[in-house]
Amino acid sequence: MIVAILSYPDSFSVFKDLSSENQNILQICCTWGKSLEDGVLTFHTNDSQHLVTDNVVKKSFEQWSSKLGKVNFLETQNASGTDVLISFNDKGKQTVGQTTNVLNDKGFIKRVNIRISVNSSEVKLAEDTIKLVLTHEIGHALGLGHSNFHDLMNPIVNYQNKVITNCEIDAILLANNWKLVENLQQPKKPELPIEKTVDCKSEQM
């Protein structure tokens, strides 16, 4: 079993256990603050050991941008000040993906750290699996929590759908409504959503 997890600050760590739900539920984790005001999120990849190809990172972000459309991802050459920092290692842990969303004092995301292990229990993961894990972790970086059904945001990689669904896109728009929806009409200040879960009903593409 390969697991991808999300780390929350203490104030965001208490979520309802989804295992008892009869519905297809997707959690909303967090909301971007002023870093998203220009509609651009920067990212930097720390892979000094060259454990993955550049194509893995590029395609993972392209998968989100092609479906979301309202956020531009810009790669930077410097880790300092980047919005999303991605690090690869070969530690061989069972948990191959972990995202830590760092929040400011008002509860908004100010930066994200994604750590990916290219090994699971000493076995090298296939490149397609690494890409799937990274795509899942980018979902966390965009404000998604976990789901209790077979889709991309399921915490167990073996149960994940490789396709980003409309429900996941709707949840990101809800999480970052102040910028990705309301800001299209007039400038808005960052605002946290009231809803913390989305009922996906069925896995719609």
State each model region's role.
Residues 1-52, 94, 100-106, 180-185, ...:
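Disordered inhibitory propeptide/activation segment of secreted metzincin zinc metalloprotease zymogens
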Residues 41-44, 114-115, 149-162:
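Surface-exposed aromatic
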Residues 138-152:
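Catalytic Zn2+-binding segment of zinc metalloproteases
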Residues 48, 89-92, 119-121, 156-158, ...:
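Solvent-exposed coil/turn segments that connect beta secondary-structure elements
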Residues 39, 82, 110-112, 149, ...:
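Residues that flank catalytic or metal-binding motifs in active/ligand-binding sites
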Residues 156-184:
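Post-HExxH zinc-binding segment in Zn-dependent metallohydrolases
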Residues 53-137, 141:
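Metzincin-family zinc-dependent endopeptidase catalytic domain
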